[in-house]
Amino acid sequence: MATLHETHTVWDHSITPIHEVEPGATVELEVRDASGGQLDRDSTAADVAALDFARVNPVTGPVFVRGAQPGDTLAVEILELRPRDWGWTAIIPGFGLLADEFPDPWLRISKVEEEARRVAFADGITLPFEPFPGTIGVALPEPGEHSVVPPSVWGGNMDVKHLRAGTTLFLPVGVEGALFSVGDTHAAMGDGEVCGTAVEAPMDIVVRLSVRRDMTISAPQYHVAAGDLARTEAGSHHVTTGVGPDLMEAARDATRAMIGHLGSRYGLDREEAYALCSVACDLRIHEVVDVPNWVVGMFLPETIMGGRA
């Protein structure tokens, strides 16, 4: 099976497909990291400041699935993800949940250990290796170029960490052939990806593409196999909360509180704590019905801090 590697940086249904397959075919695609190759093992924060944003978030594709028509559903079975041995996490000026509080570029290079199923993020902090594609979707029916950065009902940069091997993603088809693409692979991420990046890592991904005409959807859905939740789910957690009438502000408050906890309990500086929130901590909405306030929690899996206890 040949590995596909041609990329594009916008959604545009006029882009010529790089490959055509029959429904049910298995496809292997080479995914570049979210910087589009601008960052590597030897990069520094200065390289983050110099990023060319026209080159970020490349996706590999598009793949034309024969027979797929608007109104159909494309089933994407994620079969395998194979990483390289490194990844990066950055604080990018102007980007992230607390962008106004973290104005300076910051970079961390992590070691990805596929066989051990772990990511060495910092001294004494080890994350589970749980790879998935952050950006995955099909072409929009609207003409012209569309940014890959915001997600849409056609998929895109959804950053759903449960889209791991064993999960099936269902996408509405908007154009003939679906025009499937994938990119932005991550070695680890917390729900919310609050600093704007995960452990960004180049990988090869293998998927099976099928057409479902018995299923009509208006936005992405996915099926997670039994027992395929994060390995940290069963361990102990420390949880901070944000409470208030604005969901975004509640999320910001919960994140600020976790940054404070990581500093006072484990001695992390603010930048490292913010980045750790992004790659390992999960934001969750606890409560929505008791107006006027929302309750948002941020969950720290304490098992990852074993070397800092």
Describe each PLM feature range.
Residues 29, 73-76, 171:
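A generic structural signal for residues embedded in beta-strands
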